[in-house]
Amino acid sequence: MGKRRIALYHAFHTSLPIMAGYGFLGLTYGIYMHELGFNFLYPMLLAITVYAGSAEFLLGNMLLGSFHPLQAFLMVLMVNARHLFYGLSMLEKYKGLGWKKFFLIFGMSDETFALTSASKIPEGTDKGWYLLWITWLDETYWVIGATLGDLIGPFLTFDLKGLDFVLTAMFTAIFADNWLREKDHTSSISGLIISGLCLTIFSADHFIIQSMVIILIFLTLKKRKV
């Protein structure tokens, strides 16, 4: 097997939790877009070009009204501001990857960040191709789920309420897997404590960015001490 196929093999197994989560959540998004009156091309193209779940749900409503570019820009920036901190924390891991880093930056979703930041590169696997395949597979799962959701939407008659819980379950599984593999739980415990405190102080709608800033500072200081 060539290095690309080896990397794809390992990346596929690593990304299986994302396939399950994005499959169901993508279906939900596609069904939502169908209910708004859009055909499958809209969720498919938005999934390919925007690839930011929360922003895509918002854009569905925006496309129905008068388009305000500045409002759309500020809304998407506010919803996805946490990605700034994802990028900062991945600078070292993406160093020296050449052209691959451009797609890695574009495809940095919450779930992909959770995988690539915690995942150890399998022995004998090319780092660049491994990270690239994970990122590509994750986006592919989302695009397929969103497209299928719109296509099968007219044929679904059962209640889909609560389907978005799969995202919470997926993050829990990723956290548990990382916990079992790591020798030092300081980073995981600090993340839980800091997020919990920020949730209490800033409320559920405003705690994510504050949590990311504090966690980034804490981990940077911890790394310098080491």
Kindly give the residue locations of the regions a language model identified.
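Short, Lys/Arg-rich, polar N-terminal cytosolic tail immediately upstream
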Residues: 1-10
